[in-house]
């Protein structure tokens, strides 16, 4: 569903139609299993500010909210015109549960995001300019009250007066599938790191398909290859845990 103009009255009325189906007392939004082990609480904590970064910032953000839409919840995307809907669907996002809101402009960004935090379970956006401490406090108070999550997609996290609760970053990304100048890209292998506050002060890392050849996020196979691709993986086998699951590394 698209909202062409960021009219606050229209957003408020829309919010009455798409209020979260889950109770705010359920303090976590479910995330894909391949990412759950990286997060300090195993999911996205309602009322929190999460940022995704690196070359796969959009993929990470979409993957994080995919299970929410699959469970019947709503997600809003504010001012991110290059966010790929085809990629979103491949990552498990139910597009019928996504509100696309045109860029409201810097002057109305905070008010638009606040209206949507009152209506949906997750808002994906990127602040167009530094966010004042008072504005951030109001947005997060709204998120806590309504049980929603605010997700920054790409861009510098320094735009916030207070650092995000979680920062999920994909680095050393390598696309696989092309060979000798021909073939098709089948998936992207990346190291995903999670840092932040409130239980995430010690960084955790894992190598994952982002996305996998079949879409979604998948761990590295137990034999040192990547699930779905027969070619040797560029991942150090020591990063692979039992039963094909990524071995989560804590730094520091």
Regions found by a protein language model. Give the residues of each.
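Aromatic/hydrophobic pocket-lining residues that form π-stacking "cages" and hydrophobic walls in ligand
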Residues: 64, 113, 139
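A contiguous pocket-lining binding segment that forms or flanks enzyme active sites
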Residues: 117-171
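Long, charge-dense
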Residues: 74-132, 136
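Short, solvent-exposed amphipathic alpha-helical segments in soluble enzyme
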Residues: 66-67, 92-93, 140-142, 209
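Detector for small/aliphatic-rich hydrophobic stretches
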Residues: 1-77, 222-252
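Phosphate-binding/switch region of NTP-binding enzymes
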Residues: 155-222
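Hydrophobic/aromatic beta-strand patches that form the interior of the parallel beta-sheet core
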Residues: 50, 76, 99-101, 151, ...
